[in-house]
Amino acid sequence: MAFGVYKVPEEQKTYAQMTPQEQAEEGAKKMVELMQSCPGKTVMAGVSGFFLGGFFGLFMASMSYDVPIGTNAVSNIRDLPFKQQMKLQFSDMGKRTYSSAKNFGYIGMVYSGVECAIESLRAKHDIYNGVSAGCITGGGLAIRAGPQAALVGCAGFAAFSTAIDLYLRSDSASPPKNDYDE
């Protein structure tokens, strides 16, 4: 029953009382709420960063022409049998992939958590959240190396975050009249 613009809220149905379509809509609504929460964003950034870092690490390890990490005792890897060479290469590739995945996941998780916390505290969604989160993340990750490294980390992460945010927000600009006017 509606009175003007105000609509009286309906009673909440249990899942047993809902149709399959209503159950699907309710499940999708709960999933969106979870993904938009700070813990959800933080976990998703960590997992996404882990997989992206894994692919990046695998690619970089496959392009590496130097001696594998754990083979300092081997004077010349070419002197080993082919099977042993392959074993060392794949072992090294796995270590590099996991290391890169772990680092990307950690950085993504920390940055996303800090940005979400800042956005919640400020109650605004603007570029300053990303800049501040970049500075805090970069400084926090480099603090063990000293205050100068923390300052450089802060500036570097803030600049990178600003560049990415500006690029992602550039879609709101009007498109060029033709391909030559940019």
Curated annotation (Swiss-Prot):
The keyword Coiled coil does not apply. Signal peptide: none annotated. The chain crosses the membrane at residues 43-63, 127-143, 148-168. Belongs to the Tim17/Tim22/Tim23 family. Keywords: Disulfide bond, Membrane, Mitochondrion, Mitochondrion inner membrane, Protein transport, Translocation, Transmembrane, Transmembrane helix, Transport. Pfam families: Tim17. The keyword ATP-binding does not apply. InterPro entries: TIM22. It is a multi-pass membrane protein. It comes from Debaryomyces hansenii (strain ATCC 36239 / CBS 767 / BCRC 21394 / JCM 1990 / NBRC 0083 / IGC 2968) (Yeast). GO terms for biological process: protein insertion into mitochondrial inner membrane. Component of the TIM22 complex, whose core is composed of TIM22 and TIM54, associated with the 70 kDa heterohexamer composed of TIM9 and TIM10 (or TIM8 and TIM13). This is Mitochondrial import inner membrane translocase subunit TIM22. One of its GO terms (cellular component) is TIM22 mitochondrial import inner membrane insertion complex. It comes from the Eukaryota. It is found in: Mitochondrion inner membrane. GO terms for molecular function: mitochondrion targeting sequence binding; protein transmembrane transporter activity; structural molecule activity. Disulfide bonds join 38-116, 135-154. PANTHER family: MITOCHONDRIAL IMPORT INNER MEMBRANE TRANSLOCASE SUBUNIT TIM22 (PTHR14110:SF0). Essential core component of the TIM22 complex, a complex that mediates the import and insertion of multi-pass transmembrane proteins into the mitochondrial inner membrane. In the TIM22 complex, it constitutes the voltage-activated and signal-gated channel. Forms a twin-pore translocase that uses the membrane potential as external driving force in 2 voltage-dependent steps.
